[in-house]
From Swiss-Prot:
Cofactor(s) named in the record: pyridoxal 5'-phosphate
InterPro entries, per the entry: Aminotransferase_I/II_large, HisP_aminotrans, PyrdxlP-dep_Trfase, PyrdxlP-dep_Trfase_major, PyrdxlP-dep_Trfase_small
Associated pathway: Amino-acid biosynthesis; L-histidine biosynthesis; L-histidine from 5-phospho-alpha-D-ribose 1-diphosphate: step 7/9
Keyword Transferase in annotation: yes
Subunit details: Homodimer.
Similarity comment text for this entry: Belongs to the class-II pyridoxal-phosphate-dependent aminotransferase family. Histidinol-phosphate aminotransferase subfamily.
Listed name of the protein: Histidinol-phosphate aminotransferase
Organism: Desulfitobacterium hafniense (strain Y51)
Entry-annotated residues carrying N6-(pyridoxal phosphate)lysine: K221
Enzyme class: transferase
Amino acid sequence: MVDKINLEGWMRPSIRTLKAYESKSIPDCVRLDANENPLPWPPGMIEQLLGSDIAFNRYPDGGAQELKEALSRYTGVPAEGILTGNGSDELIQLLMTTFGGEKGAVVIHPPTFSMYEAAARVTGTGVLEVPLLLTETGRDFRLDVEGMLKAAAQPQVHMIVLCNPNNPTGTLFPREEILRIVAESGKIVIVDEAYGEFSGESVVDQIPYCPNLLVMKTFSKLFAMAALRLGYLLGQPSIIGALNRARQPFNVNSFSQKAGAIALNYGKEYAEQGRILTAELAKIVEALTAFASVKVFATRANFVLFQPEDPDRVYQELIGKGFLIRNMGNLPLVGKALRLSAGSPEDNERLIKALGEILK
């Protein structure tokens, strides 16, 4: 019998240094830590989904044709230019697997979504960091376009990832800067528009003209389907075809495929929810801005990054008052900061009251 195995020695070095992702869950707390849509699904949608004819004893459609046709109508991108995934996390790792690896590298702009670097490390892909720049106000960020183009010129770089609006800062980068990077870098540019429905901005319309452009979107945010893990990539058929070579054959389950296809029929209702959440976040931002001791960063998403004098204390005291937000720890350019997303109108009213009591 084997008593002990050399796990650490057998691990790839890039995995050995990683820490497992941990999602915090505190019972009886209102969750404002994951940038989810807290509002209920539009009336009739759950009934339509549960009444659907889904063969649970059969493998799902590996090509997700019904969902891709619905996405094609929603985005204007042909079905052959769409790839669906088990959440954006799977798609990010698929991108690194396909175009990265030990001989490839990706350019990212910290502070940004942590999964880009995590997926790169797992796949052995090199990471080149070109930090964002603070604007003169000190409350907003911008891309270092020249720095990103310089980094992208290195031969091992195959990809650039731009998160727009950016998580966790909420920054919306100018369209012309993104398209300049697409045009001048010559590398694959992935624009993560997970929060694009809140900003109202997108570069999807440029896909027909840019063979190196990929746009990533999700059903986890505005469409309130975080539990079902459903994301998608948009691009020209050639680059989507390349990614399909490395994709798992049945990567999106039948229930999620059907839910996504049905959700896209409720576009008007979800757009209204987006307006509600944007207005609710504005109330929270206004309340935070009223405190001179709090730095509030500009946002075009459904969340806001802010910096009180003692972030750890504010975080813990909010938990004590029934609210779980995200403690971002030490962020590049920022330092210790907190992030919270808009909740329901009722929860936001209670949150603003709690913040007032803590920050006074």
